[in-house]
UniProtKB/Swiss-Prot annotation:
Topology term for the membrane: Peripheral membrane protein
Enzyme class at the top of the EC tree: translocase
Compartments, record wording: Cell inner membrane
Protein name stated in the entry: NADH-quinone oxidoreductase subunit C
Similarity field: Belongs to the complex I 30 kDa subunit family.
Positions in coiled-coil regions: none
Assembly with partners or alone: NDH-1 is composed of 14 different subunits. Subunits NuoB, C, D, E, F, and G constitute the peripheral sector of the complex.
Keywords: Cell inner membrane, Cell membrane, Membrane, NAD, Quinone, Translocase, Transport, Ubiquinone
HAMAP family listed in its UniProt record: NDH1_NuoC
Length: 242
């Protein structure tokens, strides 16, 4: 029996709903947050699979992501109604369609030493939702979850350790969110009077600039060596040699 069939059989046996998704070179599934812990536990304890290592756990932010909740394998139904979140669109008069904007993607990367195989599990949540912590199944999840919280503000239910792990303790916001300003909210400097590091509002010493790389003033007019994307050789401008 192939690996995907074994996993789908395990999910069906435990009444866990999973949906196959396409990820290059990897076997991957999408799952709803309420099924995450039972699925992780089943994968770890299965004698046939033995996905005993959580090698990575990370997040991504897609603000316009409209992933709709769906019933996957291991369930009698063929589909499920999406959960209403923030927006409702109408295609026809008198008919409305709800869209669940799940902007955050949390990815679990599992490894089976027995099979020498990797498995990717993706969970999608909205800003107001939480994900159950996997600490009691994989102890390594604690620091991974702290990193995802630090970078994106995703809360893991059951993990009360909200200490910053990559940024400093007084950092404001979550820097990998798409709505986080490029300049940040505060800047750090060493205060000679206080004899310690101090935080203050961002004060740019020079005007904030947006570089237009399509302008010949800021980009080379010749094809860069090794640029496989270049199809035509751009004529050299005056004063610029190929």
């Amino acid at each position: 029996m192939t690996l995907d069939k074994l996993i789908e059989k395990l999910a069906a046996k435990s009444s866990i709903l999973i949906t196959p998704i396409t990820v290059k070179d990897y076997l991957a599934y999408k799952i709803e947050p309420n099924f995450l812990l039972p699925f992780l536990k089943a994968l770890k304890e299965s004698e046939e699979l033995r996905f005993t290592l959580l090698t990575d756990l990370f997040g991504a932010d897609f603000p316009q992501n409209n992933v709709v909740n769906s019933v996957g394998l291991g369930h009698k139904e063929q589909g499920a109604k999406p959960i209403t979140n923030r927006r409702t669109t109408s295609d026809n008069v008198g008919e409305s369609k709800s869209i669940d904007y799940k902007r955050f993607e949390v990815v679990y990367n599992l490894l089976s030493l027995k099979l020498n195989k990797r498995l990717i599990i993706k969970v999608y949540i909205s800003e107001k939702e939480t994900i159950p912590s996997a600490m009691n199944i994989f102890s390594a999840a604690c620091w991974y979850e702290r990193e995802v919280y630090d970078m994106y503000g995703v809360n893991f239910e059951g993990n009360d350790d909200k200490r910053r792990i990559l940024t400093d303790y007084e950092f404001e916001g979550h820097p990998l969110r798409k709505d986080f300003p490029l300049t940040g909210y505060t800047q750090v400097k060493y205060d000679e009077k206080l004899k310690k590091v101090a935080y203050e509002p961002v004060d740019l010493d020079i005007e904030y600039r947006e570089f237009d790389f399509s302008s010949h003033w800021h980009s080379p007019s010749y094809v860069l060596p090794g640029d496989e994307k270049a199809t035509d050789v751009i004529p050299a401008k005056a004063g610029i040699q190929k």
